[in-house]
From Swiss-Prot:
<keyword id="KW-0812">Transmembrane</keyword>
<keyword id="KW-0443">Lipid metabolism</keyword>
<dbReference type="Pfam" id="PF02660">
    <property type="entry name" value="G3P_acyltransf"/>
</dbReference>
<comment type="similarity">
    <text>Belongs to the PlsY family.</text>
</comment>
<keyword id="KW-0997">Cell inner membrane</keyword>
<dbReference type="GO" id="GO:0005886">
    <property type="term" value="C:plasma membrane"/>
</dbReference>
<keyword id="KW-0594">Phospholipid biosynthesis</keyword>
<keyword id="KW-1208">Phospholipid metabolism</keyword>
<comment type="pathway">
    <text>Lipid metabolism; phospholipid metabolism.</text>
</comment>
<keyword id="KW-0472">Membrane</keyword>
<feature type="transmembrane region" description="Helical">
    <location>
        <begin position="51"/>
        <end position="71"/>
    </location>
</feature>
<feature type="transmembrane region" description="Helical">
    <location>
        <begin position="6"/>
        <end position="26"/>
    </location>
</feature>
<dbReference type="GO" id="GO:0008654">
    <property type="term" value="P:phospholipid biosynthetic process"/>
</dbReference>
<feature type="transmembrane region" description="Helical">
    <location>
        <begin position="84"/>
        <end position="104"/>
    </location>
</feature>
<keyword id="KW-0444">Lipid biosynthesis</keyword>
<dbReference type="InterPro" id="IPR003811">
    <property type="entry name" value="G3P_acylTferase_PlsY"/>
</dbReference>
<keyword id="KW-1003">Cell membrane</keyword>
């Protein structure tokens, strides 16, 4: 099988994997409101945190990361060129953003992109995670933390392993573009800050 055929199959598989909306599925399984029509309207881990609590958000986060990590790792093991590897990673993110199984209404793709970058190396993953956490804690805006982490990702990659700078840059551009509405809301002061749903404790 040629490298082009393998790449096409991996791109298709990555898109289909990315199209599995874990936020919608987790909310359905746990009897939570549909994240596409509640909270911020974004079917991602941050919105699930708002409407469903920490445990549900963690489940969504881990699954979304795996959607990016598994196709990228398989492509890496198959020896695909770094640009082709980038296309596979972008396909997984596009599946998350425009899921064919959920009327093409998806999330921002941040967790999936992070998962796709993680196989490059644990150093990069730690840098990105630390960057997101620092700016999320400072600003209380998940979108700001995501945009800054995505913008710095190509620089981190160039420093750690320059072979993968181009595919990471492709993901970074996609993430920043996907946050255009958040950037507008930040500019107008309408962006929602991070918060966690507080459940009422039942008394017995």
């Amino acid at each position: 099988m040629s490298a082009v055929t393998i790449t096409i199959l991996m791109i298709l598989g990555a898109y289909l994997a990315g199209s599995i909306s874990s936020a919608v599925l987790v909310c359905r399984l746990r009897g939570l409101p549909d994240p596409r029509t509640n909270g911020s309207g974004n079917p991602g881990a941050t919105n699930v945190l708002r409407i469903g609590g920490l445990s549900s958000a963690v489940m969504v986060l881990l699954f979304d990361m795996l959607k990016g990590a598994i196709p990228s790792y398989i492509s890496y093991k198959l020896g695909l060129d770094s640009v082709y590897l980038g296309l596979v990673a972008v396909a997984a993110c596009l599946g998350h953003i425009f899921p064919i199984f959920f009327a093409f209404k998806g999330g921002k793709g941040v967790a999936t992109a992070f998962g796709a970058m993680a196989p490059i190396g644990e150093d990069l993953a730690l840098f990105l995670l630390a960057t997101w956490l620092v700016f999320a804690l400072i600003t209380r805006y998940s979108s700001v933390a995501a945009i800054i982490a995505a913008s710095l990702a190509p620089l981190y990659t160039w420093w750690l392993d320059e072979r993968f700078t181009i595919p990471v840059a492709m993901l970074s551009v996609l993430i920043v573009i996907r946050h255009k509405d958040n950037i507008h809301r930040l500019w107008t002061g309408e962006e929602t800050k991070l918060s966690r749903k507080k459940r009422d404790k039942k008394t017995t």
